[in-house]
Amino acid sequence: MTSHAPESGGLVTESTLGASNSSQTIENKGLTILGISGRRLAAVLIGWFFVIFDGYDLIVYGTVQSALAKEWNLSSATLGTIGSTAFFGMAIGAVFIGRLSDRVGRKAAVIGSVLILSVFTMLCAFAPNPWVFGAFRFIAGLGLGGLVPSVNAMTSDLVPRKTMSAWATVMMSGVPIGGSIAAVLALVVVPSSEEWGWRFMFLIALIPLVVGLPIAMKVIPSDKAIKADHDIREGHDEPAGFKDLLVDRYRWISIWFALATFVTLLAWYGLGTWLPRLMETAGYEFGHALMFTLALNLGAVIGSVVTAWAGDRFGPIRSGVIAAGIAGIALLLLLTYPPVTAVYVILILAGVGTHGTQILIIAAVANFYPSNLRGTALGWALGVGRIGAVVAPQLAGLLLAWNLGVNSNFIMFGTAALLSALALSVLLRLQKTYSVTHKVEIQG
């Protein structure tokens, strides 16, 4: 490379390219967190802010299910179908907007995702019937699905490789933080008004639209500047597309990443969507049911910290095997009808394991693929994997509609977590094989 960073530090701009024949890492000045500062840090933090609202939007439907069922006289099967619409949109958004972030640029993909997510989540508050509500949730899901791979790809381009796993963990910690906010807010807001209580929960989507987007437009660097900055620090990558994920070098790794994400998200999003309703069906009051949801999300926040440490020390895939195994065993323990205190502990462990495993998978994908494939690879894994998120609410509703009881759901979610551990074990084995035959550098 023949370009270098300006002496003043900060992000490279087009005017600085070609200024010198030497290549060096861009200097960071000011407050530094995990190796970045200045505009890079501001861009990454606004991305994290958006992920918090991504997490809020994922959990908010579960907190208002009972109110929707009462207002529109909905069955469990119909509630499951409506719950799946957002996840179906997420699956599509993750694949196509993830790819768009590689082709058009990170900034455009992030801002476009937030715009779609915020506008159509807000419109859910004014839905006159469940069918319009479901349509708005589907379109909002397109933005939901595109946001996480786009933000993670942008973050991976802006942070040093040595702190990439830690930053991936920070990014995804926003999901359970947002979910916790949804659970706490619902305790007060949903019972406050029979007509507008649940609707107000969706008006919160105005915050990223009104507050976040203007800041993002200012602090997220241009796509050309992000690419130039990354090329100077990490080297230039040739253009690549979906087909490159399935060539010999990446084929089985890509397939198993998608399978691992499928079963992990089936467990995580299934719980996030149905836990309040399941606990109410099991005989707990609405307030207690939401507190269980809060425990699940607080466990996921704790899991973000624990998996950051474990992923850095032992590798994301190896740590993911343990995390998913813990979640699976914990969820199956609910079949023993434990006391309330034990239920809280079990759900905290389930949050640590399910969401923590997904964070570790994202970190492994970001570490494994080159920059020109990173957004596409994240979109592939999250897009195909989110079919599990689509299936989970529908299956959970059907299991209840078939009178198979609450425990049938816990069996499904617990088994999914154990299958995630199995899939990651296969990836761990493939990693060892590929590191010999292809010299692939994937942190295990």
UniProtKB/Swiss-Prot annotation:
Disruption phenotype: Deletion mutant retains 85% of its transport activity at pH 6.5, but it loses 79% and 88% activity at pH 7.5 and 8.0, respectively. It comes from the Bacteria. Changing residue 386 to A: Loss of transport activity. Changing residue 309 to V: Loss of transport activity. One of its GO terms (cellular component) is plasma membrane. It is a multi-pass membrane protein. One of its GO terms (molecular function) is carboxylic acid transmembrane transporter activity. It is found in: Cell membrane. The chain crosses the membrane at residues 42-64, 79-101, 108-127, 131-153, 166-188, 198-220, 252-274, 289-311, 318-340, 344-366, 378-400, 410-428. It holds the Pfam family MFS_1. Belongs to the major facilitator superfamily. Aromatic acid:H(+) symporter (AAHS) (TC 2.A.1.15) family. Transport of gentisate (2,5-dihydroxybenzoate) into the cell. Does not transport 3-hydroxybenzoate or benzoate. This is Gentisate transporter. The gene is genK.
